[in-house]
Amino acid sequence: MIIHGNSANMHQIRNEEADFVITSPPYLSDLSYLDWKKPLKKQTEIDRVEKDVVNFALKLKPVFKEIRRILKSGGALVIQTKDLRYGGFIIPLVDLHCDLVRQLGFRLVGRTAWLPKTVRPKLRTKKDAYNISSGFRTLDTEIFLTLTTPEGLKGEKSAKELEKELEKGDDLKVEDIVKPLWITGLGRHGKSNHPDASPIPPVKRFIALFSKKDELVVDPFAGGGTNLWAAKQMNRRFVGYEINRNYVLEAKKLLKIK
């Protein structure tokens, strides 16, 4: 099910009831989002924008406290996040999210970068083809942080089980799961119902890795329900929370629930 409400209070879920939590928190306030969408030449207030990004991230702390409450001992929390590029500079949001959840008792066990197969370098050089220094930038990856409780990961799944569950839509081999960079397609059919919908292949990999059939998967920032849809396709029970009513309606359409 998906619940229209603030995930700082997930009272519908008991203590340590969730087997796995996978989510992507919002990155920007409405004000910073408008700044971020400006043309590059007009992105001139990085100090103010970075301060707002930090303050906005810290406001999500009550949600992460609730995640700590509902996640079973030894369960996994996967957070999709990314560093933000503004005015040619990088705001290190990944480290901010990681530090925030670690302060609440989680322990970091993995960091996976993801790129879509269709990515192309967008290095805008000056007319002098040899002068690329001032226009240097690296490709921007999505980062999936894997964390767990202080007891350490307690999941039990064999390599054979993992490959069997993924074989229908993913050519992943177990030895690839530990690689620091995953490159896949988006895995979507048609237009996404949310501007920041997660890529489906890595989401399915994490669901397969850290949960089993009929176990409970929770997404506290459900958006248009992409993660919940993936969980449903993989025969998991699922609960999502979304504060925006319009996206709740979109998610219900995707999940085919009333």
Labelled PLM ranges:
Residues 252-258:
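Short, conserved SAM-binding/catalytic segment
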Residues 1-250:
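Core catalytic lobe of class I
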